[in-house]
């Protein structure tokens, strides 16, 4: 695979990552849906992919960056797969994902705590085309991982 095609792929990854983060932030801040903790964690690989794509666009060593990008999206597949499993009731959360943070005894503290409750990771509050954002993230990350493995295998050093 030529360097020019790899460069185009990094542009696609940059665009996909930018769009994915933009949608997540739009859903949160414009539409008003508060994300669960796993939804927030799932943004991290896309932020890393943005940075890697920018570096790759200006750096000559694309193969190493492809490897890092592949590992990043593999982590995204695992994280989003875990989240989808929780949403579907297949997997029980390992850590508190329920938003049960009301340990306050005073009225003011209880009211303040109610405003800061994280949504339960099992609940799908927002979906696109009937598919949860965690499921869409899993699909996007899985496809990108497969493409990255293919490109890595056939890329020039």
Give the residues covered by each predicted segment.
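Membrane-embedded alpha-helical transmembrane segments of multi-pass integral membrane proteins
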Residues: 16-23, 49-52, 72-82, 140-147
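C-terminal TM-helix exit segments that contain a strictly Trp-centered aromatic cap at the helix terminus
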Residues: 23-28, 75-90, 107
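Membrane-interface capping segments at transmembrane-helix boundaries
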Residues: 150-157
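Immediate flanking context of iron-sulfur cluster ligation sites
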Residues: 17-34, 54, 87
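Interfacial segments of alpha-helical transmembrane regions
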Residues: 4-15, 55-77, 146, 150
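Extracytosolic (periplasmic/ER-lumenal) interhelical loops and adjacent juxtamembrane/interface segments
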Residues: 88-134
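Membrane-interface loop-to-helix entry segments
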Residues: 38-48, 111, 129-143
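Non-cytosolic membrane-interface motifs at loop->transmembrane helix junctions
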Residues: 33-43, 95-98
């Amino acid at each position: 695979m030529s360097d020019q095609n790899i460069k185009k792929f990094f542009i696609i990854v940059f665009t996909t990552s930018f769009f994915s983060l933009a949608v997540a932030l739009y859903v949160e801040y414009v539409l008003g849906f508060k994300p669960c903790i796993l939804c927030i964690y799932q943004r991290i690989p896309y932020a890393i992919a943005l940075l890697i794509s920018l570096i790759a666009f200006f750096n000559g060593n694309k193969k190493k960056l492809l490897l890092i990008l592949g590992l990043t999206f593999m982590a995204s597949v695992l994280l989003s797969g875990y989240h989808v499993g929780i949403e579907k009731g297949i997997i029980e959360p390992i850590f508190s994902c329920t938003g049960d943070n009301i340990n306050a005894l005073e009225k003011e503290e209880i009211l303040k705590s109610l405003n800061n409750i994280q949504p339960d990771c099992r609940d799908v509050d927002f979906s696109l085309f009937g598919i949860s954002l965690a499921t869409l993230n899993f699909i996007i990350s899985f496809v990108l991982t497969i493409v990255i493995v293919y490109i890595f295998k056939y890329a020039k050093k």
